[in-house]
Amino acid sequence: MQAASNPYQQYLQNAVLTADPGRLTLMLYTGAVKFIRQASDCLAARDIPGAHRANLRAQDIIVYLLETVNREMEVGKNLSALYDYMYRRLVEANVKKDPAILEEVAGLVEDLAGTWEQALKLKGQQAAGG
């Protein structure tokens, strides 16, 4: 892994390398939303190559989530189907240059992130005995 060139990059790299799986999933959701919003902003600015790059980065995150989900449990099967849907919609948004589709997917990922964040808080409270 290449050394980070500035303090912010070093901080982010350290945060990712030391995050537990639950926190890492939340970071992935946050990153996906960031890139989806970036793609939408690029479309609004008529920066088609920028929108394409940002959309591909969001797709990469969704594919990673799809590949790592545990499909042995019912919730994993449901998440897998949702990730697959989001991926297909991102591809469609990229082809059609449609910001409405990007907004739809961003909303889905934000909902997942909110739910995941609540689950992490509950897990933390249970671990603390509360």
Predicted regions and their residues:
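C-terminal-biased regions
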Residues: 1-130
